[in-house]
Amino acid sequence: MKTHLATLATLAVFAAFLCPSQAAIVWTGATSTDPFDDTNWDFSGSGVSAVDANVSVADDILIANGSIEIPNLGGQQRVQIGNGFTMTLDNTTFGLVAGGNDGTGGQPGSSGVNINLINGSQFNPFFIVNAVSLDIDSTSSATFGGGGNPVNISTINLTLGSTLSFRSETPAAFTAEHLSKITVNGVPAVEGDNIEIAPFNGGSGSQITAIPEPSSAVLLGFAGLALALRRRK
């Protein structure tokens, strides 16, 4: 009996691990691409009832197979994620209307929020701010429109295959202001080691590509050589 109960407990743990919790606020895009139009959201699984500019959303957010454009409101506005919560973009484009200079982030003094880009998502804000941890999977990209400090009090983790671009930060500006905020698979970014930095947007910007570390490339080379020798036999 004890063995049977232990087995059931183990299966329950694995089931919880394999079945991630659903986001409580879900994008429907029923009316428009405006994230501040509440008719575009399904709040039925949440205690939250609105998404307003510069007001913390105290729940996880899921935007799947969608297209969002932050409207060009007065001043710089943002989709503001509540402390400790996550916004996930799944096969989604998240950007700005023409001429927009808005972004997303946490509240001032935030203890940390997460933005995850998966399944070919494109994240194109002017900036992120206030303790954002942005994670970009191997199929997704992020392009920041702003200059100055578009990655403000925030960090970015790249995966091999992901792309990070800045429209108004030259390679020199990126290196001086943002290199220390970037990791590749959790390891600090080092130019020529695990990232390459190239000019972008006619030279006024920069594009960062994650590359295999030299040790990984050597191992892949040895593996390819071993496979070729085996085939010759």
Residue ranges of each PLM-predicted region?
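Conserved Rossmann-like nucleotide-cofactor binding loop
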Residues: 225
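Bacterial N-terminal signal peptides that target proteins for export
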Residues: 1-9
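Beta-strand-rich extracellular passenger or scaffold domains
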Residues: 24-29, 35-210
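C-terminal membrane-anchoring or membrane-association module
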Residues: 228-233
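Short, threonine-centered small-residue motifs that mark membrane-proximal processing/anchoring sites
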Residues: 12-15, 19-25, 204-222
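Short N-terminal leader segment in a subset of presequences, especially plant chloroplast
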Residues: 9-12, 33
